[in-house]
Swiss-Prot record:
It comes from Danio rerio. One of its GO terms (biological process) is centrosome cycle. Its main location: cytoplasm. Keywords: Cell cycle, Cell division, Cytoplasm, Cytoskeleton, Microtubule, Mitosis. GO terms for cellular component: centrosome; cytoplasm; HAUS complex; mitotic spindle microtubule. Component of the HAUS augmin-like complex. The complex interacts with the gamma-tubulin ring complex and this interaction is required for spindle assembly. The gene is haus6. It is found in: Cytoplasm, Cytoskeleton; Cytoplasm, Cytoskeleton, Spindle; Cytoplasm, Cytoskeleton, Microtubule organizing center, Centrosome. This is HAUS augmin-like complex subunit 6. Pfam families: HAUS6_N (PF14661). Contributes to mitotic spindle assembly, maintenance of centrosome integrity and completion of cytokinesis as part of the HAUS augmin-like complex. Promotes the nucleation of microtubules from the spindle through recruitment of NEDD1 and gamma-tubulin.
């Protein structure tokens, strides 16, 4: 019976696998951790397996009906859904059993209550076979063959032959697969049998080892218990023996024969009693205790001890009767010592008062004088030598290293050794006494460089302040055209464009230049060279950024700092921003003083607008051509080639540094040698920001015009009715794109030699500066006056 039960369970599991049952992808209840699916799943009650198998078979038989019937009880979550599931399954099983010609066994409700046992397994096996039969009848792969058609008689021999061949092929395929399965099963069985025998042998071996280990463990436990018991007995014996050690010694002495070996004999003992003790013993109070000390010629030890005790009492009483000598204090000696100590204390207090009142004041005064002398010495020392020279081993390394123009990279070791800083002290004393002379020399050097500024193009920079830093944004530019003669047309092709360098882009062309061997010079020569070098640097910085709007410092303070370039207490700033900030005010003051002296000469000249009234016919024909595409410059070369005079009292609206008349005074040249420029070289103001009314533009500009006032020349007033062509040119210039000015001759005004000299001149290397030659003399250029165009009358 058990064998049949196992066989039915195995067949049931195989049928489920043939129907594509996947035990890994099932879920029936909330907790499926202990789900048991396999051949022995119904050996014990297994509700979860019952739910899964029944639902799978009914869903395989009729999916639509199964979904409709089990929609309220699948998945099974509680007792209510469990009862509903059993009810639906029982009804469906009864329908299958009641079909005609069905061999399905009789179904009872009790079969579904306990999902285990042979009857339940047999019921599930018949249900699985029924589902397999229904599935086989509906099997169709290509729509050409149905199993039920095999029972229909063949219509011809060919059809019967085809059926036979089809069945034969299927039978052969199944047979081959079955044979392959059997062979594979046999191979695996052999391998498993061998491994099973090995495992059995290993299991037997480990069982024997386990038994031996258990027996040894038990034996050790028995031995350990006996040892503990024996140790307890020995402890008890030791405790008993220690308590009866005296008795043991007596027994041992008796056993060893040590009894009666020693006898206390007092025959030779004679007791002598003092008179005081004898009298005491003869008193009536001691008569009762008075006994004989000898009995049978031997002294009695107990009585002798009692007599000794009485003798001790007598001795104590006699000692109490004796009175010892009394201690007498010598008060006179103590008083003498106290008086001596008091006098010594008064003398010490007197000495202390004298030290505090007299000597301490003198010592403090002397200490103060010494401190003042030390402070004076230290201050004088610091004036001559910086503090960092005392703190470091090499004081020269603390100074500013020689650098190229606007470069913050340190120079090489060879440059350090050849520099002036390594050969001369940090602060020459003989030059400190002549600050006024150095200041005057520096001022003259700055004014002397005024004529060199005309050789470079000027760009107006408007400062735009942001939260983090000041960004220089270029605005309207002032262009200086190339030299135009009457025989050369102004539309000449421009071959190269050289942009004006920015002060924020330091030049690094001579970063690796090797310094020459230093020649010994006097301190005055070194100072003069350094001042000239710094003045040239200041001029270049002011030309590159005339629009830097920052707080100005006093020229006197700046020149005092320049007078001693090697002073470590007040070193010069080595950043482009700080150089421009410190130089700008001093340069403006120098230019303002020059302008004030030269403005007197320009007031007596003729009206500045007289040159505009010159008829256009007097001009040469090549000079009349306007080339907007190539240079965007409107250049009019006058016949007389004289610079236009400046009208006295005219408003300042020019972005140029100074006019042509001022250049004539500085360069001491005649006006006929100077090239004239027209208004076309000036960019008109922005129509959205500044109106064409020059008077209102000055009022709206505010602080910006105040900063540019020092470098603006006097400009005459012009009306559009007098110069219609000039107004047309101005409108064309304002509407044209500013990007075209990149090819204008202003970028060609700075030649290669001049740009190289201005780039390399910004250096603190005096040897290298001495070797440099003066900049090549470029063509003398003058800048025209701007014309105020007033549209109010039109």
């Amino acid at each position: 019976m058990s064998k049949l039960k196992k066989t039915d369970g195995k067949y049931l599991w195989w049928c489920l696998l043939c129907l594509k049952f996947k035990p890994d992808n099932v879920s029936v209840t909330k907790t499926t951790k202990h789900l048991n699916l396999g051949m022995n799943m119904f050996d014990k009650p297994n509700k979860e397996a019952f739910y899964i198998v029944i639902h799978f078979l009914f869903n395989k038989l009729n999916p639509t009906r199964a979904q409709d019937v089990f929609r309220n009880c699948w998945l099974v979550w509680d007792h209510k859904s469990d009862a509903e599931f059993r009810k639906v399954a029982f009804a469906w099983l009864q329908e299958i059993a009641n079909e005609e010609g069905s061999a399905f066994p009789k179904v009872a409700a009790s079969h579904l209550l306990s999902a285990f046992g042979p009857k339940f397994i047999n019921l599930m096996l018949h249900l699985a076979k029924h589902v397999m039969l229904k599935t086989m009848k509906t099997f169709n792969t290509d729509g050409m063959w149905v199993p039920e058609a095999a029972a229909v008689p063949a219509s011809s021999e060919e059809m019967e032959l085809k059926r036979f061949q089809l069945v034969k092929r299927q039978f052969q395929r199944v047979t081959v697969e079955q044979d392959f399965l059997i062979q594979d099963y046999q191979k695996r069985a052999k391998v498993l049998e061998k491994s099973l025998r090995d495992l059995d042998a290993e299991n037997a071996k480990y069982d024997s080892l386990l038994k031996e280990h258990d027996s040894i463990t038990d034996l050790k436990e028995v031995i350990l218990a006996k040892v503990q018991k024996l140790r307890g007995l020995w402890n008890e014996v030791d405790r008993f023996l220690s308590n009866h050690q005296g008795k043991r010694d007596i027994v041992a002495s008796v056993i060893n024969g040590q009894v009666d070996q020693y006898i206390l004999c007092g025959q030779e003992l004679n007791v002598k009693m003092p008179a005081a003790l004898r009298e005491r013993m003869e008193r009536p109070s001691h008569q009762s205790s008075a006994v004989r000390l000898y009995e049978g010629g031997q002294p009695v030890l107990v009585r002798l001890l009692a007599l000794l005790n009485e003798g001790l009492h007598v001795l104590r009483e006699e000692r109490e009767k004796i009175v010892g000598p009394s201690v007498q204090l010598q008060n006179q000696d103590v008083q003498e010592h106290a008086l001596l100590f008091t006098r010594s204390k008064e003398n010490l207090n007197l000495i202390r008062w004298k030290l505090v009142k007299e000597d301490a004041a003198e010592i403090k005064v002397s200490i103060g004088k010494l401190e003042e002398e030390w402070e004076c010495k230290w201050a004088n020392c610091l004036k001559n030598t910086p503090l960092t020279c005392f703190l470091e081993e090499d004081p020269v390394l603390d100074l500013v290293s020689p650098m190229v123009a606007l470069s913050f990279e340190p120079a090489s070791e060879a440059s350090f050794q050849a520099s002036v800083i390594s050969q001369y002290p940090c602060k020459p004393h003989d030059l400190l006494e002549q600050p006024s002379k150095e200041k005057l020399d520096t001022t003259v050097a700055v004014v002397h460089l005024e004529q060199e500024v005309h050789l470079k193009p000027e760009i107006k920079i408007s400062s735009v302040a942001t939260e983090d830093q000041d960004v220089l944004v270029p605005s309207d530019s002032c262009f200086s055209p190339e030299h135009v003669t009457c025989g050369t047309p102004p539309c000449e092709t421009i071959l190269s464009v050289i942009e004006t360098p920015s002060p924020k882009q330091p030049c690094h062309t001579n970063l690796h230049s090797k310094p020459k061997a230093s020649v010994l010079k006097t301190k005055a020569q070194i100072l003069d060279l350094e001042c000239d070098n710094l003045a040239s640097q200041f001029a270049d910085a002011v030309i590159m950024s005339p629009g830097n709007q920052r707080s100005d410092v006093d020229l006197g303070q700046l020149l005092n700092a320049i007078s001693d370039p090697f002073s470590s207490r007040k070193q010069l700033c080595r950043t482009p921003e700080s150089l421009i900030k410190d130089v700008r005010s001093s340069w403006r003051k120098a230019v303002e003083e020059g302008l004030a002296e030269k403005k007197q000469a320009s007031w007596n000249q003729q009206d500045s607008l007289s040159w505009l009234k010159t008829p256009m016919a007097n001009m040469n024909s090549p000079c009349k051509t306007l080339n907007l595409e190539s240079s965007m410059s409107f250049s009019t070369n006058l016949d007389n080639c004289t610079s236009p005079p400046v009208q006295q009292g005219s408003t300042l609206h020019s972005t140029l540094s100074w006019d042509s008349s001022q250049m004539e005074v500085l360069t001491s040249q005649c006006s006929s040698d100077v090239i004239k420029f027209s208004i076309a070289q000036e960019e008109p103001p922005d129509l959205f920001d500044v109106s064409f009314n020059s008077d209102s533009s000055v009022e709206n500009s505010g602080e910006k015009a105040r900063d540019e006032e020092l470098c603006l020349p006097s400009v005459g007033l012009c009306y559009l009715d007098e110069t219609p062509q000039l107004t047309e040119q101005l409108c064309l210039g304002a509407s044209s794109d500013k990007s075209v000015f990149k090819d204008s001759p202003v970028h060609l005004s700075m030649s290669k030699d001049l740009s190289h000299w201005t780039t390399d001149h910004f250096s603190l290397d005096l040897d290298r500066l001495e070797s440099l030659s003066s900049p090549p003399r470029a063509e003398n250029l003058t800048l025209p006056n701007l014309v105020n165009v007033n549209l109010d009358e039109y």
